[in-house]
């Protein structure tokens, strides 16, 4: 999805497209039309902005001061929160599709991750990743792994 070319630089426009894509992907998986996909919310140097602000996500990662109490950049982090909320909607959609004795989610493995572990430095050390789904019984749910790097 090329947000600038499509004229959807604001998060609201991108979110509407993502939510439509969530439905299409869920149907494609349920109908066994695909088994592998990639969903990207914006390009690496994101030009997305919050409604009412001209500051882009990428600019905020470089220029926004880190909140000392919280330990992160509040405005830049909003973009990650939006992305993860959309991912959660996708996971919930898959969980709502019956398949066999369970759900489509029970038979999938859906990976989500952020581009960086720290927006300001663009570090990938300790990159947060999540996997949802049961992988057809091959994955054990509820496991937290803290990797060293």
Language-model regions, residue ranges each:
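Ligand-binding pockets and gating/stacking loops
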Residues: 1-149
């Amino acid at each position: 999805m090329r947000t600038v070319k499509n004229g959807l630089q604001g998060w609201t426009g991108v979110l509407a497209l993502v939510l439509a894509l969530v439905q299409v992907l869920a149907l494609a998986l349920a109908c066994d039309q695909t088994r592998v996909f990639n969903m990207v919310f914006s390009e690496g140097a994101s030009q997305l902005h919050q409604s009412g602000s001209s500051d882009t996500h990428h600019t905020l990662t470089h220029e926004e001061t880190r909140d000392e109490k919280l330990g992160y950049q509040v405005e830049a982090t909003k973009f990650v929160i939006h992305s993860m909320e959309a991912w959660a909607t996708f996971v919930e959609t898959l969980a709502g599709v019956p398949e066999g004795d369970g759900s489509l989610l029970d038979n999938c493995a859906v990976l989500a991750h952020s581009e960086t572990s720290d927006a300001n430095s663009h570090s990938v050390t300790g990159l947060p990743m999540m996997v949802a789904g049961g992988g057809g019984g091959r994955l054990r749910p509820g496991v937290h792994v803290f990797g060293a790097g």
